[in-house]
C-alpha cells in the first residue's frame, strides 16, 4: 500500500524537475522560430518513456515554435540526461497549450453575459 503513494509523488517531482530543466535548456536554443516560450506543464507516462510538454508562446508563432521544439527534442533530451539522476529520460513531445486562450475567451463571454444581464435589468 505504501508504494502506491510513493510512485505518483515521484512522478510529480520528476515532471516538475523536467519542466524546470527544459525551460532552462530552451534558452540555449538558437532557432529563430522559437519565440518567448513558457513551459506550462509536463505529463510523464508511468514508465518514464514519454513526456508531453505543454507550452505557451508570448512572442512568435505557436505552430512554428511547436515544430522547432519537436525538432530540438533530441538536443533537449540529451541535456536532460546530463541533469537528471534517473535511469530513463523520457522522449519529449511538445504540444501548444491553448489553456490561456480558452480562459480569455471564457472571461470575455462571462463579461458579455454580465453586460447583457445588466442591460436587461435596467430596462
UniProtKB/Swiss-Prot annotation:
A molecular-function term among this protein's GO annotations: ribosomal small subunit binding
GO aspect biological process, one term: maturation of SSU-rRNA
Endpoints of the signal sequence: none
Residue stretches spanning the membrane: none
Cellular-component GO terms for this entry: cytosol
Subcellular location: Cytoplasm
Major localization class: cytoplasm
Annotated keywords: Cytoplasm, Ribosome biogenesis
UniProt KW Lyase keyword: no
Pfam families for the chain: RBFA
Positions of disulphide bridges: none
InterPro entries: KH_dom-like_a/b, RbfA, RbfA_dom_sf
Keyword Nucleotide-binding annotated: no
Role according to the record: One of several proteins that assist in the late maturation steps of the functional core of the 30S ribosomal subunit. Associates with free 30S ribosomal subunits (but not with 30S subunits that are part of 70S ribosomes or polysomes). Required for efficient processing of 16S rRNA. May interact with the 5'-terminal helix region of 16S rRNA.
Subunit note: Monomer. Binds 30S ribosomal subunits, but not 50S ribosomal subunits or 70S ribosomes.
Family, per entry: Belongs to the RbfA family.
Alphabetized HAMAP family for the sequence: RbfA (MF_00003)
Name of the featured protein: Ribosome-binding factor A
Species name: Leptothrix cholodnii (strain ATCC 51168 / LMG 8142 / SP-6) (Leptothrix discophora (strain SP-6))
Gene: rbfA
Amino acid at each position: 500500500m505504501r508504494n502506491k503513494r510513493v510512485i505518483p509523488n515521484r512522478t510529480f517531482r520528476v515532471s516538475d524537475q523536467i519542466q524546470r530543466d527544459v525551460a532552462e535548456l530552451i534558452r540555449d536554443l538558437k532557432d529563430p522560430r522559437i519565440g518567448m516560450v513558457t513551459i506550462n506543464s509536463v505529463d510523464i507516462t508511468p514508465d518514464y518513456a514519454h513526456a508531453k510538454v505543454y507550452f505557451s508562446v508570448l512572442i512568435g508563432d505557436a505552430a512554428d515554435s511547436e515544430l522547432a521544439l519537436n525538432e530540438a527534442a533530441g538536443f533537449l533530451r540529451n541535456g536532460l540526461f546530463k541533469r537528471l539522476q534517473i535511469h530513463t529520460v523520457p522522449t519529449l513531445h511538445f504540444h501548444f497549450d491553448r489553456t490561456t486562450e480558452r480562459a480569455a475567451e471564457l472571461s470575455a463571454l462571462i463579461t458579455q453575459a454580465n453586460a447583457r444581464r445588466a442591460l436587461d435589468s435596467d430596462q
